[in-house]
Amino acid sequence: MTDSTRSLRNCLAPAKLNLFLHITGRRPNGYHDLQSVFQLLNWGDTLHFTLRDDGKVARATDVPGVPEQSDLVVRAANLLKAHTGTAAGVDIEIDKCLPMGAGLGGGSSDAATTLLALNRLWQLDLPRAELQSLAVKLGADVPFFVFGKNAFAEGIGEELAEVELPTRWFLVVTPRVHVPTAEIFSDELLTRDSKPVTITDFLAQQSSDARWPDSFGRNDMQQVVTSKYAEVAQVVKWLYNVAPARMTGSGASVFAAFQSKQQAEAAKAQLPAGWNGAVAESLNEHPLFAFAS
């Protein structure tokens, strides 16, 4: 990343994985209570921010299928601008890397990187807690990325507690299918009564188990998604023959963990022709963590 008084270049918006995802209840307003552990990855979209003197917020990159004013990046910048009353503006360029509808948090991460970067570029110096309260208005996953640490999440995903996770390498395989999150959450067959667990439960079973993530929990959405989307089921089955595999979020991406980059790359090399896979290292902290206190 490069930093100047007029611009911030090469700001990573990291992907996340749900190492497990349990749905423990449903609220009267339709939202679901969940428990999960969010893992940051050193892989994601890259954003570039340049100051404007006319006060306007503009997206300088076309993102197919995402109109500018509904883009979470633009919405995040306008929300921060309205909240603080700053006269500053910004041009935002986005180098998209993460697929949409994949369970990797791409749009949410872009929004969080925007909040953190503009907190620095616009010299706002808002505390992290204040940025997180804004992030809630943009989506359930955005507060986690502003939080900036690997986390045990509860509630609708906004109750976060830092967890220390070992360094791992991941192979993430994304089938060519878009899984609408709302469709999965509304499915009658979705498990909504998983027994609550604790951070201690998770940490006790994940630290050194060779069968991890199999050794702890599951993704409650996986069975519904694989029953509806054969492409996801095919990836889960194939990857599971290489290493314990699990879907992240509401899909469609599926991941497996490895102890080394070499192991992950070797698994990637075996992918069937035409499949989309990426090897990524775990992160302990968001690259822009220092941009809020």
From Swiss-Prot:
Pathways per UniProt: Isoprenoid biosynthesis; isopentenyl diphosphate biosynthesis via DXP pathway; isopentenyl diphosphate from 1-deoxy-D-xylulose 5-phosphate: step 3/6
Keywords tagged on the record? ATP-binding, Isoprene biosynthesis, Kinase, Nucleotide-binding, Transferase
Quote the InterPro entries the UniProt record gives.
GHMP_kinase_C_dom, GHMP_kinase_C_sf, GHMP_kinase_N_dom, IspE, Ribosomal_Su5_D2-typ_SF, Ribsml_uS5_D2-typ_fold_subgr
Q: Where does ATP bind?
A: 99-109
Highest taxon of source: Bacteria
The UniProt catalytic activity note for this protein reads:
4-CDP-2-C-methyl-D-erythritol + ATP = 4-CDP-2-C-methyl-D-erythritol 2-phosphate + ADP + H(+)
Q: What is its EC number?
A: 2.7.1.148
Q: Does the keyword Signal apply?
A: no
GO terms for MF: 4-(cytidine 5'-diphospho)-2-C-methyl-D-erythritol kinase activity; ATP binding
Q: Specify whether Kinase is a keyword of the entry.
A: yes
Catalytic residues (UniProt): 16, 141
Q: Which family does it belong to?
A: Belongs to the GHMP kinase family. IspE subfamily.
Q: What does this protein do?
A: Catalyzes the phosphorylation of the position 2 hydroxy group of 4-diphosphocytidyl-2C-methyl-D-erythritol.
Q: Any idea what this protein is called?
A: 4-diphosphocytidyl-2-C-methyl-D-erythritol kinase
Where does this protein come from, organism-wise?
Answer: Burkholderia multivorans (strain ATCC 17616 / 249)
